[in-house]
Regions:
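Membrane-embedded translocation segments of transport machinery
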Residues: 178-252, 256-271, 277-282, 292-296, ...
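Helix-loop-helix junctions within the multi-pass membrane cores of secondary transporters/permeases
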Residues: 13, 17, 36-43, 48-49, ...
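Transmembrane helix-loop junctions in multipass membrane proteins, especially transporters and channels
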Residues: 25-29, 75, 81, 105-121, ...
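Juxtamembrane and boundary regions of transmembrane helices in multi-pass small-molecule transporters
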Residues: 84-139, 298-354
Length: 354
């Protein structure tokens, strides 16, 4: 789909990652699409940071609209005593977050200079550090279709499994594999099936640009993300205490509190469970809580989240880079615009349904 419509990659990329997260209940499904997004954008002459940034943001905010995500299931249970049911929550969150992603994509489409005018890109191009894949050079192997079907089948299985083990569906109780572990296991099994059934020379895999980018991203995820979460986990109680005290004095600041808390807690579910009960207990209106729910998706602010780091590493043009001031990275503005739009739309839609 992305390869067939390269000219609109900045808008189609977040649609794909949003829908995948919506169905699977986890943003880690975006890992499989990031290399394709980067390659298609580069081939079209589009600055890869534009579609990559909003695609990552879409994969994060879609958690607050996914029927099977832990954050939505937990929040729905909290809202039930206040007369807001599960379906009403979804009826508000799904359209508002999707429209917000499209607004964010529109903003991202104007971020940064054109790729051909980027000095970093030109420097890397001169040094031969960028691999350009043109249509003339692309050779489609006869087994490509089979490999694609295996890959799509694996994604479909992951989505179904995530739904089956979720609290809202509950077909599988006490699953042996959690959602994230299942994604890794199934996708590795799919990779093995592709290698064996399509008779791929395994020795050539480490030389592939996508494999090198992916492994580099793995190292970044293991190191930087682990380090960041270690620091934050040591101060979780303090974060909750400060946020709770702020909400008690200023209930209207719920969206801001959730934004900054999720930035540190690295989890939509953890932020929801930590702060939403306190917010509802001190008298925050259900409409305000539902409208502010999207703000628990500010995982892009600190550039240490796995999908964000993967996007940076998979863009060999250098357009998706983290600035020396930490916060000046291409994910920040589209992310803030998307969350702000989702909250504003949440009040509009929520006012009609609650």
């Amino acid at each position: 789909f992305l390869r067939k419509h390269p000219e609109r990659i900045t808008f189609y990329a977040p649609i794909v990652t949003f829908l995948m997260t919506l169905m699977a209940g986890t943003g880690h499904t975006a890992f499989s699409t990031l290399p394709v997004i980067a390659e298609v954008a580069k081939g079209q002459g589009v600055r890869p940071s534009r579609p990559l940034s909003i695609a990552v943001v879409a994969s994060q905010i879609a958690i607050t609209a996914s029927p099977i995500s832990a954050a939505v299931v937990a929040f729905a249970a909290m809202l039930h005593p206040f007369g807001v049911d599960y379906l009403t929550l979804l009826a508000i969150c799904i359209p508002t977050t999707f429209i917000a992603c499209m607004i964010g994509a529109f903003v991202a489409n104007f971020m940064g200079c054109e790729l051909k005018d980027d000095p970093e890109y030109q420097e890397r191009l001169e040094k031969g550090l960028i691999k350009l894949n043109t249509e003339a050079k692309r050779e489609i192997l006869p087994t490509a279709k089979k490999a694609t079907f295996i890959f799509l089948g694996a994604i479909a299985f992951v989505v179904c499994y995530a739904a089956a083990i979720s609290g809202s569906v509950g077909l599988i109780e006490n699953p042996a594999l959690g959602r994230n572990e299942a994604i890794m296991t199934v996708m590795l099994a799919a990779a093995a099936a592709i290698v064996m059934s399509c008779k791929i020379d395994a020795g050539k895999i480490p030389a592939a640009a996508t494999f090198r980018s992916g492994m580099t991203a793995c190292v970044c995820v293991l190191g930087v993300a682990w380090l960041g979460s270690t620091f934050v986990n040591a101060h979780v109680d303090g974060i909750k205490e400060v946020a709770g005290a702020l909400l008690a004095d200023y209930p209207w600041m719920l969206a801001l509190v959730l934004f900054f808390a999720s930035m540190l807690l690295y989890s939509q579910g953890a932020t929801t469970v930590a702060l939403m009960p306190a917010a509802l207990a001190i008298g925050v209106a259900p409409l305000t809580a539902v409208a502010s729910f999207a703000a628990v998706s500010a995982l892009f602010v600190l550039p240490t989240y796995p999908t964000l780091l993967a996007a940076v590493e998979m863009d060999d043009t250098g357009s998706t880079r983290i600035g020396k001031y930490v916060f000046n990275h291409p994910f920040f503005v589209p992310g803030v615009v998307t969350i702000a739009s989702a909250v504003a739309l949440g009040f509009a839609f929520g006012g009609l349904l609650i």
